[in-house]
Amino acid sequence: MKRKGFIKQIFGVTADGRVEQLSELHIPAGTRVVQSFLISTLFEDNGASFKKVILPNSVKEIEHAAFANIRAEQVLFKNGLEKIDGYAFRGVGIRSENLVFPKTLKSIGHYAFAENRIPKFSQDNSLKKVTLPQNCEYYKDSFDPTTEVVGGKLIEE
């Protein structure tokens, strides 16, 4: 069965498995779901580092650990995104002072942005502040304890 809107291939990996140094990772337009472990499996072991990860407005969901442990200084979320599953961006090292999410975002899973530290300065939390739409549900552990969360609805467990 052919599934439309799923990433099938990412360019930038050489035939022998090395990653070409990419400054930006663009998820293809039309992609609706970034599957679990997809990006992290392709790039984590290769030491890839990106200035930006750019998601098109067609992406509705980012599944469990899709981007976990890759390096990306900035992630650009577009309107249309509704759900970020647990561990999706765990350990990514986003260096944004204020990460703003689209108004369409409804939920952020457990540990989605946890352990988001710059590797050279492991005690420094690089994600200082996040701004969520008022209707977006998140957990206390969705972000590191030192990250300021503005907006959203905290789910008490």
Residue ranges and their predicted role:
Residues 1, 5, 17-33, 44-61, ...:
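Structural signature of tandem-repeat unit edges
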Residues 11-14, 35-40, 66:
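Surface-exposed repetitive/solenoidal architectures
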Residues 12, 63-65, 69, 85, ...:
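Short, intrinsically disordered, low-complexity terminal segments
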